[in-house]
Amino acid sequence: MLYQSDDIHLIYAGGTFGSHGTPLSPLPAHEFLPVLQNLLNSRLDSRQVILDNDRIKDSSTLTPADFTHFYELIRTAHQQGARRFVLITGTDTLSFLASFLSHAFADSDLSLVITGSMNPLLVADNPAYHIDDTSDAWHNLSDAINVSQTRQGVFVQFCHQTFWADNTQKIDSLNPNAFYGTHVSHPSLTFPTIRPEPFDIIKHHANTANIKSIFLLPNDTNHIVQELANINDNTTAVILIAYGVGNLPKSDAIIAELDRLHGQNIPVVCTTMCPFHGVSTTYAAGSWQYAHHVWSGGKLSIPAIYGRLLWLAVNNALSSDNW
């Protein structure tokens, strides 16, 4: 099938945007998409094509295999002529997926805008599927479509803000202004370019990917040692979520575990539980770890780190040189 480069190619992946009922759950495609298509036809002049997608779910259940599914769906449509994409997904893992896709299409000539909503497009308790004009859903979608027509790259569009997709984070569980990131008015981050492997290899690695996290709490240092000791060979990488600018307790046992993980080629990336400004080597309480092969998360959010690690892992490129 060939696509027109000027058309907007929509992918509906579920989430609050297309949810309905009490409690909310994503509507199946055969019920929701005709309603969405009619709305688009009545309110927009541009032509939209809804791509076939069988992965419609609450975003809290997305896995690496789902991430690579969306990569392949977009890549295939791009090979057939499509250049403008809008992906509607749930907000829980939107930033994780956006980061992954931003690296996947870093050097592509497409426009890909990832969006969602904090409230459903439809009135939740009305069985007639009426549009809720007080919801943020339509505003986010129409803004995303506009961005796909005017910018090239991979973006997150939310609450009238356009962010580079490689480094965003959901910072509010209720309000429409739920995301934070690097606005497109500022330069985007730069990363080493990774040439994608054939999709069968990417798919294989996604099925076995296992990125773990350790969230520090003010417990006895031995608890950190035990959590590190529990990391085994089937782990792809570890995200160490530390205090402040990346501070964490230091002990001989922790150092030994960090050295062990390095010897097993399991990267450990340090980030912060703080939502803004990332980690640094300002304090001795955190800088010591980098002498023991820990990678710095820099100013990347936790979802941004996950997305970058996963893209490197599925392409056999998980190394400090590529980080």
Identify the meaning behind each predicted range:
Residues 2-323:
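Active-site histidine-anchored catalytic micro-motif
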